[in-house]
Design a protein with these regions (language model features):
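PLP-dependent enzyme catalytic core of the Aspartate aminotransferase-like
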Residues: 79, 143, 154-185
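Conserved glycine-rich beta-strand-loop-beta hairpin in the small C-terminal domain of fold type I
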Residues: 89-93, 107-119
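Short glycine/threonine-rich loop-to-helix capping motif typified by GTGT followed
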Residues: 116-131, 160-166
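Phosphate/diphosphate-binding loops
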Residues: 23-29, 132-144
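Short acidic (Asp/Glu) and glycine-rich catalytic loops that position anionic groups and cofactors
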Residues: 49-52, 69-78, 113-122, 168-174
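Short, glycine-/Ser/Thr-/acidic-enriched flexible segments
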Residues: 26-29, 41-44, 77-79, 112-113, ...
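Short, conserved charged micro-motifs
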Residues: 45-46, 124-132, 180-185
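Conserved PLP-enzyme active-site core in the AAT-like
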Residues: 1-101, 127
């Protein structure tokens, strides 16, 4: 059992089991841009490093400035602290409760950093060819100034051979919860 282990210990053990990982650090790394690839396999490293230099920057910084690398290190540390994780989860739960009150459908269970609203069920009058999640994303911003992100048909891109839109899967509006805000104050 893990009930007596710290989040840092659980995280360390989890990553010890992986051959490799990627992370977009914009959310839980508390930086404005960046991320990383980590691997213990030499051949994966050798295969990836050429792309780093070509597209991102030298291997030691990958296109990130020193300030963002320092912020990422702090963010990774802070996000293995129980109090921070608990606060974040409670923020997401709070939004989920509000959506429940208004019977707005979303993916359950609620996540650790975001809520995914089922746009096809909210905008039933918008056909899939008019991209319900993108429509909801735009309208929510115009009406309330709330910035979300479409995770669905547009993100799925078009079929590379037929160039037709791909409409299989879900069409969701992601509402990522900002960090370090006074949600309930």
């Amino acid at each position: 059992g893990y009930q007596d282990k710290s989040i840092k210990e659980i995280t360390r053990e989890m990553f010890d089991l992986a051959d490799g990982m990627t992370m977009s650090a914009k959310k839980d790394g508390i930086v404005n841009m960046g991320g990383f690839i980590a691997t213990r396999r030499k051949e994966w490293y050798e295969g990836a490093k050429g792309f780093c230099v070509q597209y991102e920057g030298y291997l030691t910084y990958g296109g990130m400035n020193g300030r963002d690398m320092n912020a990422l290190a702090i963010g990774l540390d802070e996000n293995t602290e129980f109090d921070n994780l608990e606060t974040r989860i409670k923020q997401v739960e709070y939004l989920a409760q509000k959506l429940d009150e208004y019977e707005i459908p979303y993916q359950r269970p609620a996540g650790g950093h975001a809520i995914f609203v089922d746009a096809s069920k909210v905008l039933t009058h918008v056909p899939k060819e008019e991209f319900p999640a993108q429509t909801l994303t735009v309208e929510l911003y115009l009406e309330a100034g709330i910035r979300g992100c479409e995770i669905g048909y547009i993100l799925a891109d078009r079929d590379p051979i037929t160039h037709e839109n791909r409409f299989n899967g879900l069409d969701l509006l992601r509402l990522a919860i900002p960090r370090r805000v006074y949600t309930l104050s």
